[in-house]
C-alpha cells in the first residue's frame, strides 16, 4: 500500500498553532502553488479536523487524505485547477 503522505509537493508545519492560524497559513501556501500540486499539512490543533476539510470544500480543493486518529494530524490536499 502506498503512503499518500510520503511525497507531497509542499509541506506546511502548523504544529503549535491555534485557530485561525493553521487555515490562514494553508490559504497563503495554496495561493502560491500550481493547480494539481499537493500540500501536506501537519497540525495539532483540534479545530483543524473541522477547518481543513471545510477550507477544501469552500475553495474547491481536493482533500486527498487525512489522518486524525492521533497527534499530529496529517492532511493532504490537492490544489484545484
Swiss-Prot record:
Reported function: Sulfur carrier protein involved in sulfur trafficking in the cell. Part of a sulfur-relay system required for 2-thiolation during synthesis of 2-thiouridine of the modified wobble base 5-methylaminomethyl-2-thiouridine (mnm(5)s(2)U) in tRNA. Interacts with IscS and stimulates its cysteine desulfurase activity. Accepts an activated sulfur from IscS, which is then transferred to TusD, and thus determines the direction of sulfur flow from IscS to 2-thiouridine formation. Also appears to be involved in sulfur transfer for the biosynthesis of molybdopterin.
Pathway recorded for this protein: tRNA modification
Biological process annotations from GO: tRNA wobble position uridine thiolation
Record PANTHER family: SULFUR CARRIER PROTEIN TUSA, SULFUR CARRIER PROTEIN YEDF-RELATED
Classification of source organism: Bacteria, Pseudomonadati, Pseudomonadota, Gammaproteobacteria, Enterobacterales
Family to which the UniProt record says this protein belongs: Belongs to the sulfur carrier protein TusA family.
Main location: cytoplasm
GO CC annotations on file: cytoplasm
Active-site residues, record numbering mapped to chain: 19 (cysteine persulfide intermediate)
GO MF, any single term: sulfur carrier activity
UniProt KW keywords: Cytoplasm, tRNA processing
Protein name: Sulfur carrier protein TusA
Subunit note: Interacts with IscS.
Record localization: Cytoplasm
Amino acid at each position: 500500500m502506498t503512503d499518500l503522505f510520503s511525497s507531497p509537493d509542499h509541506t506546511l508545519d502548523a504544529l503549535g498553532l491555534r485557530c485561525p492560524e493553521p487555515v490562514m497559513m494553508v490559504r497563503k501556501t495554496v495561493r502560491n502553488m500550481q493547480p494539481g500540486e499537493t500540500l501536506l499539512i501537519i497540525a495539532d490543533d483540534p479545530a483543524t479536523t473541522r477547518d481543513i476539510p471545510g477550507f477544501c470544500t469552500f475553495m474547491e480543493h481536493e482533500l486527498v487524505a487525512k489522518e486524525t486518529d492521533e497527534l499530529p494530524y496529517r492532511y493532504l490536499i490537492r490544489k484545484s485547477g
